[in-house]
């Protein structure tokens, strides 16, 4: 059974009244509020001092890998180093109060697993995977010399570290738009 935490002397905002309640107790088991009102005991007791507890906010546009260092450094850094910085940023994000994040693009599944297994501290992560972006869009981190020129060109750094995109913008012509290639060449 999950441990309990008893928050004593807290005021609860219930969403129905305009002001928080008088001081009361909130019992939490694991990560679930089990009860509000006078409670006998918990495995851990925290005196709220009349404050209003709130669940941790959700950051719906967070990037585990990119938030950890400036873009210029990110583009040239070794992936193992980036992973360590991302773990540090995850802990900082949690300490700022966000208990859940939606990763908005990048290879965050390994970091999510490390957090879920208790290896590193961080918020609950809902990973996105690769960013979908058109060529030269905000999710295209390729340097000009990395753009493949032939089918056998070496993989770009973005592809090597597993952050490749799923889709790309219009490339060449098609039966419906045969002049797309001509427009690109102008």
Language-model features, listed with the residues they occupy:
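A generic structural signal for alpha->beta connector loops
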Residues: 42, 98, 122-124
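Divalent metal-coordination and catalytic microenvironments
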Residues: 10, 26, 31, 50, ...
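General beta-strand structural signal in soluble alpha/beta enzymes
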Residues: 46, 102-103, 127
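Metal-coordinating catalytic core of metallo-dependent amide/deamination hydrolases
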Residues: 119-186
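Metallo-beta-lactamase
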Residues: 40-43, 114, 155
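Histidine-rich, glycine-flanked metal-binding segment
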Residues: 2-3, 12, 16-55
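Metal-associated gating/positioning segment near the N- to mid-region
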Residues: 51-117, 135-142
């Amino acid at each position: 059974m999950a441990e309990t935490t008893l928050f004593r002397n807290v005021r609860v905002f219930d969403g129905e009244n305009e002001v928080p309640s008088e001081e009361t107790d909130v019992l939490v088991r694991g990560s679930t509020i089990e009860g509000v009102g006078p409670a006998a005991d918990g495995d851990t007791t925290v005196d709220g001092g009349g404050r209003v507890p709130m669940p941790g906010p959700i950051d719906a546009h967070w990037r585990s890998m990119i938030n950890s260092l400036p873009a210029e450094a990110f583009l040239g850094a070794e992936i193992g180093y980036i992973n360590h910085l991302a773990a540090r940023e995850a802990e900082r994000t949690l300490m700022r109060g966000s208990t859940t994040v939606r990763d908005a693009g990048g290879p965050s599944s390994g970091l999510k697993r490390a957090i879920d297994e208790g290896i590193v501290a961080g918020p609950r992560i809902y990973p996105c995977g690769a960013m979908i972006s058109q060529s030269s869009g905000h999710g295209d981190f390729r340097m000009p010399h990395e753009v493949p020129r032939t089918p056998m060109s070496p993989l770009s750094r973005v592809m090597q570290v597993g952050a490749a995109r799923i889709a790309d913008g219009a490339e060449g012509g098609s039966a419906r738009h045969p002049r797309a290639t001509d427009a690109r060449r102008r």
